[in-house]
């Protein structure tokens, strides 16, 4: 799981990435949306400001796969589809808790897909994980999307 902290001010991006790292969250800092797009396969969540070095948050949202959540740290910004606006006055600790919640939901989805593969595919946990990663890479989708596809394949997608 990799979180991208993307802000036009590179120092702010670094501070947020460092805060996330202190909570045990793998994070990268970037000032541009294009930097995130280059690492799109690895990124599982984006935390960003309204304006980035080379584009706006809504433009980045349109370029990212729908299954990659975007959290917007821009109090007063209009609510847009696919972007979760975070409230004003959020502390770094509160931001980290929100990110952990999102990551936990994704990890639960991946775990469900692995359990389905173990039950129906006759593989062990390590093999299920490798197969899930391979499916994501071969399909060019995120691990979350690959897990959703596996659950759909096995008819266990009712809560997606």
Regions found by a protein language model. Give the residues of each.
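A short, hydrophobic beta-strand element within the central beta-sheet of small alpha/beta folds
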Residues: 67-76
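Conserved phosphotransfer microenvironments
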Residues: 13, 33-37, 42-68
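Conserved acidic segment of CheY-like receiver
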Residues: 1-10, 16-20, 46
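C-terminal output/effector regions of signal-responsive regulators
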Residues: 106-160
């Amino acid at each position: 799981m990799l979180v991208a902290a993307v802000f036009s001010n590179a120092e702010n991006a670094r501070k947020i990435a460092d805060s996330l790292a202190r909570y045990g969250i793998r994070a990268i800092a970037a000032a541009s949306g294009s930097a995130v797009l280059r690492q799109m396969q690895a990124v599982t969540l984006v935390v960003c400001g309204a304006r980035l070095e080379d584009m706006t948050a809504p433009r980045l949202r349109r370029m990212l796969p729908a299954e990659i959540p975007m959290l917007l740290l821009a109090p007063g910004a209009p609510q847009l589809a696919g972007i979760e606006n975070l409230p004003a006055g959020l502390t770094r600790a509160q931001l980290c808790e929100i990110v952990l919640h999102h990551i936990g939901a994704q990890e639960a989805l991946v775990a469900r897909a692995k359990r389905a593969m173990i039950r129906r595919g006759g593989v062990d946990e390590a093999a299920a994980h490798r197969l899930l990663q391979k499916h994501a890479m071969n399909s060019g989708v995120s691990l979350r999307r690959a897990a959703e596809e596996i659950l759909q394949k096995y008819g266990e997608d009712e809560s997606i």
